[in-house]
């Protein structure tokens, strides 16, 4: 019988000045084989007066749901928008019997509605905005989407395959050849966003990616701009090659980031690494 077993689980959005959390779980998809998943969460305040990043990891009837949000700095109550978004995603995902691209799209809609409702209640329609990334994992697939410039990367067999494209001015300039992809993180307009939660939409602005078949030796990274701006894709790849679980991958990247940002004012920094492996046999033995 298919079942989901967590050795440890985190159900609610979490935040504080600095957190490291490691979890491991087993997702059955056949009687004699299963997917082993471990994930690691890191968040830190950096040199900012408060941490406006939020995350949620949820065990759901359909599988696992990860949400990561970065409240817009310089705007009022960005951390509230980020927490509302993560709460809305977690609550929606926990009520779903199955995951799909439609479920991801609906999760973004629920998050947008939650932020707009709070804006209206507090007469604060021009502020309170956030990015949001969502990853849903069931027994067969990864469903994922984003809005803003927080990123999701995924890799297979230790090789990076794809990342979400930022909804930013610099990503747009890169698409038309005016900025090199590798230079996005250094561009003066990198924080000018074109899509976020908390701005009224005429039509949904979140972008969903094609589902990815869930398989062993698969890795996923969700991260805010305070993380990816200080590590290149080449460095992420090197760290991945030198790792065999989510915690080591995260620690390898954080070590490089600490070297790269020594002369910079550190932004809030939050990331989730997910490591998926195949297993065989009876785990109850």
Where are these predicted regions, by residue range?
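PP2C/PPM-type serine/threonine phosphatase catalytic domain
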Residues: 3-285
């Amino acid at each position: 019988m298919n079942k989901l077993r967590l050795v440890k689980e985190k159900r609610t959005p979490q935040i504080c000045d600095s957190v490291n959390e490691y979890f491991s779980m087993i997702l059955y998809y056949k009687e004699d084989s299963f997917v082993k998943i471990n994930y690691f969460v890191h968040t830190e305040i950096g040199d900012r007066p408060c941490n406006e990043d939020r995350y949620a990891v949820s065990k759901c009837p359909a599988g696992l749901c990860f949400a990561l949000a970065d409240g817009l700095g310089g705007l009022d109550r960005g951390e509230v928008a980020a927490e509302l978004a993560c709460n809305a995603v977690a609550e929606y995902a926990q009520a779903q019997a199955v995951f799909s691209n439609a479920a991801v799209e609906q999760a973004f809609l629920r998050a947008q509605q939650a932020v707009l409702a709070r804006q209206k209640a507090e007469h604060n329609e021009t502020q309170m905005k956030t990015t949001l990334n969502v990853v849903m994992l069931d027994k067969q697939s990864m469903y994922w989407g984003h809005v803003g410039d927080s990123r999701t990367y995924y890799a297979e067999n230790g090789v990076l395959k794809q990342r979400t494209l930022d909804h930013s001015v610099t990503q747009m300039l890169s698409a038309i050849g005016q900025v090199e992809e590798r230079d996005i993180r250094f561009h003066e307009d990198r924080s000018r966003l074109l899509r976020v939660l908390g701005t009224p939409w005429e039509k949904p602005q979140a972008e969903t990616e094609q589902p990815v078949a869930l398989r062993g030796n698969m890795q996923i990274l969700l991260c805010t701009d305070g993380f990816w701006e200080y590590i290149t894709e080449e460095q992420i790849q090197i760290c991945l090659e030198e790792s065999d679980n989510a915690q080591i991958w995260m620690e390898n990247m954080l070590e490089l980031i600490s070297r790269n940002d020594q002369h910079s004012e550190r932004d809030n920094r939050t990331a989730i690494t997910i490591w998926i492996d195949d297993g065989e046999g009876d785990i109850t033995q």
